[in-house]
Design a protein with these regions (language model features):
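A short, acidic, flexible beta-alpha connecting loop/helix-capping segment that sits on the rim
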Residues: 59, 66-70, 77-79
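Cysteine-rich, disulfide-stabilized extracellular repeat modules
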Residues: 7-9, 17, 30, 43-49, ...
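Gly/Pro-rich loop segments of beta-rich domains
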Residues: 1, 27-54, 78-93
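Structural signal for beta-propeller blades
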Residues: 19-22, 69-71
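Residue-level detector of Asp-centered blade-edge/turn motifs that repeat once per structural unit
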Residues: 5-8, 55-58
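Primary detector of tandem Cys2His2 zinc-finger arrays in metazoan DNA-binding transcription factors
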Residues: 12-14, 21-24, 28
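Conserved beta-propeller blade signature
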Residues: 11-12, 61-62
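Short loop/turn segments immediately following the C-termini of beta-strands
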Residues: 16, 26, 66, 76
């Protein structure tokens, strides 16, 4: 549903059906899972039908985790294939 391309040409995609966030580096033929990918869930670094994503000015990634009624914030290593690190949780009703 949601796609973001950063200044370096890296593509970030919400994969709602598989409950994960994917990343493709510029000119890469394959992507990697940076958040989720462990099945549906409500634990940190798990998602339940993510819907949107956005970076802030500091490079933190915010993911709207629809079925868990929350927004998760992750610190992302943009220079390697390291997965995102869970930082904060915002709950909403």
């Amino acid at each position: 549903r949601s796609v973001v391309i950063d200044q370096m040409g890296t593509v970030y995609v919400v994969d709602s059906i598989n409950h994960r966030i994917m990343r493709w580096f510029k000119d890469s033929k394959s992507g990697n899972v940076i958040i989720g990918g462990r099945g549906i869930g409500s634990e940190p670094n798990q998602l339940s039908y993510p819907e949107d994503l956005q970076f802030d000015r500091q490079g933190n990634l915010y993911v709207v985790d629809l079925n868990n009624n929350r927004i998760q914030m992750f610190t992302i290593d943009k220079s390697s294939c390291v997965k995102g690190t869970f930082e904060k949780l915002l709950l909403f009703e």
